Amino acid sequence: LINKYGSVRGERGLPKLLPGLNFIAGLNGETESSYQMNLDLLHEIRREGLLLRRINIRQVEGEGFQDIPQKAFNMFKTNVRDTIDGPLLEELFPLGEELSDVHWETHDGRTRLTAHLDETHTSESCRGKAGITFGRQIGAYPILIGVEYHIPLETQSSVIVTGHGARSITGVETGLQAEKVSQKQLEAIPGIGEKTAWKLISQRAKRKRKNPGQEAFDSAEEWFKATSIDWSEDYSLYFDHQ
């Protein structure tokens, strides 16, 4: 019932409400077969087409608890991450899905530092420069989102999902402007890459030198065609519609 109604995507691009599961290893009475039973349960959930927002696997240790069979525990954890978590992540955050209201937290690492409050990290001047920006949507157990260029911290924006990690996803912002987008921003768009991005930036610079004070191109599509680069409708997901 929760999946029936909770799997509907809301305004921010996420399913509205999904359950999570916690597996605790080391409880009294547990045996090695317990891990296989837990894995069988997860596979049954997936065969039924049900979604889970998260799966936590924890170890309980200390006086009064039994020893954990490490080999069985590690195999269970690896199986869950490889056969359950990966496919779930791709289904929850499919390629091309737009996620809105992402809050940008850190540059070039997942740990929030005092330095990240400096103007060098929060001002608009850092946008599009080389590096990685990490952010999340507000909520319980928000997915970590990485973007392969700098975005001013303490800001929010929308992204298109472009890839999946083990426990995170990558994305590229929407609303990129052909007049301002940097080479690093272009490189982050699937299907473009470093060489094509350099050609586009060079063509824009030439056009601006030829027509100073004017916009180089009326649209991203015109820009690509003027650079002899095939335009894909997929690119329109990322660019501002002028």
Features from the language model and the residues they span:
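Terminal RNA-binding accessory module
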Residues: 77-179
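C-terminal extensions
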Residues: 176-188, 199-202, 210-242
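Catalytic cores of secreted or luminal carbohydrate-active enzymes
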Residues: 50, 56-67, 72-93, 97
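Conserved C-terminal portion of the radical SAM core fold
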Residues: 1-66
